[in-house]
Swiss-Prot record:
InterPro entries listed in its UniProt record: PSII_PsbK, PSII_PsbK_sf
Gene coding for it: psbK
General function of this protein: One of the components of the core complex of photosystem II (PSII). PSII is a light-driven water:plastoquinone oxidoreductase that uses light energy to abstract electrons from H(2)O, generating O(2) and a proton gradient subsequently used for ATP formation. It consists of a core antenna complex that captures photons, and an electron transfer chain that converts photonic excitation into a charge separation.
SUPFAM superfamilies: Photosystem II reaction center protein K, PsbK (SSF161037)
Full protein name: Photosystem II reaction center protein K
Assembly mode: PSII is composed of 1 copy each of membrane proteins PsbA, PsbB, PsbC, PsbD, PsbE, PsbF, PsbH, PsbI, PsbJ, PsbK, PsbL, PsbM, PsbT, PsbX, PsbY, PsbZ, Psb30/Ycf12, at least 3 peripheral proteins of the oxygen-evolving complex and a large number of cofactors. It forms dimeric complexes.
Similarity-based family: Belongs to the PsbK family.
Propeptide cleavage-removed residue intervals: 1-24
Chain ranges passing through the membrane: 40-60
Any Pfam family: PsbK
Keywords for the protein's UniProt record, in alphabetical order: Chloroplast, Membrane, Photosynthesis, Photosystem II, Plastid, Reaction center, Thylakoid, Transmembrane, Transmembrane helix
UniProt membrane topology term: Single-pass membrane protein
GO CC terms in record: chloroplast thylakoid membrane; photosystem II reaction center
Source species of the chain: Cucumis sativus (Cucumber)
C-alpha cells in the first residue's frame, strides 16, 4: 500500500513540475522551431489513432 501511495505521490510531483515546461520558452537560436515544438506532444496520439485505422483496414481480426 505504501508503494502505491508513494508512486501516486511521485506521479503528482512530476506532473506539477512538468507543467512548468509548457510555459518555458526556447532560446532565441531555436525560436524558428517553435511551431514544431508546439505540435510534438500530439505526435504520440497520431500513432494511437493509426492503430485503430490499421485495425479497421484489416477488419479488426
Amino acid at each position: 500500500m505504501l508503494n502505491i501511495l508513494s508512486f501516486i505521490g511521485i506521479c503528482l510531483n512530476s506532473f506539477l513540475y512538468s507543467s512548468s515546461f509548457f510555459v518555458a520558452k526556447l532560446p532565441e537560436a531555436y525560436a524558428f522551431l517553435n511551431p514544431i515544438v508546439d505540435v510534438m506532444p500530439v505526435i504520440p496520439l497520431f500513432f494511437f489513432l493509426l492503430a485503430f485505422v490499421w485495425q479497421a483496414a484489416v477488419s479488426f481480426r
